[in-house]
Structure formats: C-alpha cells, structure tokens
C-alpha cells in the first residue's frame, strides 16, 4: 500500500516528502481554504515538491462546469488528478475527462455500489471515506474490503484511496483490507512514527554509550 498525504500545507508536505514515504498528495477546497492562499499557487508549489499524483478538486456541481474546471486543473502539471464528487453529474464529467486522457479521483464514496459505478465511468481512483462512516456507526473498513474484493474479481484497474483516515489503526486495517493507497493527514503520520519503546530504547543506547566513554 502506498501513502499520499492529505493536506494543502506546504510545510507538512515538505516534511513528509523528506522522510521518503509519500508518493502523492490529496487536497480539497476545505484544505486549500484553510491555508488562505490562491489555489493555483498552492498546487504549483506542491507539484514542485512531490513527484507523484496530486489531486485538486473541482467546486462546480454541473457536469459541463466540472469538465471545464477539470481541464484547467489538468493543465497545471502532468501529475494533476482531477478530484470529482460522487454524483451523477460527477460521473458524466469523469467519463469525458477520462476519454481526454485526464486522470480522475472520485471522492465522497460511501458504498461499494458508488465505487463500482465510478470505476465503470472510468475513474482512475475512488476515495471511500472511513472516518465519516465510523462517525455514523457504520464500518468503513468493511467498505474498503468489499470494494477491493469486487475490483479484484472483475479485474477493475481503478485504485482505491482510503480517505478520512483518523488514526494509525485505520492505516494498518486499510492495508489488510486491500486498499492500494491511504491518504493520511500529517498528524497521523506523526503518530505512526512514534512508539514509547523506540524512545526508551534510544535513551538506553545513548546512556550506555555515555557510560562506556567514562
């Protein structure tokens, strides 16, 4: 399973990229708005940091407008992926953009039926949301497993991006469930890096080294 980072914060992207474990970035209008910067400026800077898929989301709801917006996003950089909401209009836009060779990421997926429709419309990626399903008492990991099974049975090339990842356990369970990618907030990556036994082990090594020098 590969890792994308889910943020529009350039400093977080730089830190994660420096550690060598991310291969792409996902953004959305909320994340970009949080940074208080121009969308194009943020995306251009991100593409200069990470050499991999960068998802930029449309804000229109009608297919024709999404298509026009998607074409603009795709022209920013060859690595751009157009993120489109899971609606009928969204899938109509996915079909056209796919035919034009533009990669798409269908977002806000909450059922296996939605994922299957998005895949058949030509989506490069589908993004099922784990945390938001958990919030309403559903099981997001069952959804990931169901989508992965369906795609494998039918030889569907669309990749699964696990989104709305809230904690390290989500990440491990997504990997076990068959997700191709997990898009993870920087704070969750920080949690994944740490373990108390690692810290105590380092402290002991350093203490032993200092004692040996005396």
From Swiss-Prot:
Q: Does the keyword Transmembrane helix apply?
A: no
Q: What class of enzyme is it?
A: transferase
Q: Which UniProt keywords apply?
A: Cytoplasm, Pentose shunt, Schiff base, Transferase
Give one Pfam family.
TAL_FSA
**NCBIfam families in the cross-refs:** fsa_talC_mipB (TIGR00875)
Q: Which Gene Ontology CC terms are recorded?
A: cytoplasm
Q: Which family does it belong to?
A: Belongs to the transaldolase family. Type 3B subfamily.
Task: Tell me the Gene Ontology biological-process terms attached to this UniProt entry.
Answer: carbohydrate metabolic process; pentose-phosphate shunt
- Do the record's keywords include Transferase? yes
Lineage of the source organism?
Bacteria, Bacillati, Bacillota, Bacilli, Bacillales
Location of this chain's protein in the cell: Cytoplasm
According to UniProt, this protein's pathway is: Carbohydrate degradation; pentose phosphate pathway; D-glyceraldehyde 3-phosphate and beta-D-fructose 6-phosphate from D-ribose 5-phosphate and D-xylulose 5-phosphate (non-oxidative stage): step 2/3
Please describe what this protein does.
Transaldolase is important for the balance of metabolites in the pentose-phosphate pathway.
Instruction: List the active-site residues.
Output: 83
Q: What is this protein called?
A: Probable transaldolase 1
**What catalytic reaction does the record list?**
D-sedoheptulose 7-phosphate + D-glyceraldehyde 3-phosphate = D-erythrose 4-phosphate + beta-D-fructose 6-phosphate
According to its UniProt record, the EC number is 2.2.1.2
């Amino acid at each position: 399973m590969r890792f994308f980072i889910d943020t529009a914060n350039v400093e977080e992207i730089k830190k994660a990229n420096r550690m060598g474990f991310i291969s792409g970035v996902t953004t959305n209008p909320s994340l970009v708005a949080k940074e208080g910067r121009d969308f194009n400026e943020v995306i251009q800077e991100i593409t200069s940091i990470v050499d991999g898929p960068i998802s930029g989301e449309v804000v229109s709801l009608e297919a024709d407008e999404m298509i026009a917006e998607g074409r603009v996003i795709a022209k920013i950089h060859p690595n751009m992926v157009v993120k489109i909401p899971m609606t009928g209009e969204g899938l109509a836009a996915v079909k056209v953009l796919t035919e034009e060779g533009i990669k798409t990421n269908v977002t806000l997926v909450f059922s296996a039926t939605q994922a299957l429709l998005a895949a058949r419309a030509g989506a490069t990626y589908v993004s099922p949301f784990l945390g938001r399903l958990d919030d309403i008492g559903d099981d997001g990991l069952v959804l990931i497993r169901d989508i992965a099974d369906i795609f494998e049975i039918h030889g569907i090339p669309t990749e699964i991006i696990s989104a709305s990842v809230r904690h390290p356990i989500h990440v491990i369970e997504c990997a076990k469930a068959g997700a191709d990618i997990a898009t993870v907030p920087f704070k969750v990556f920080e949690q994944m890096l740490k373990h108390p036994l690692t810290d105590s082990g380092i402290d002991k090594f350093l203490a032993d080294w200092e004692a040996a020098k005396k």
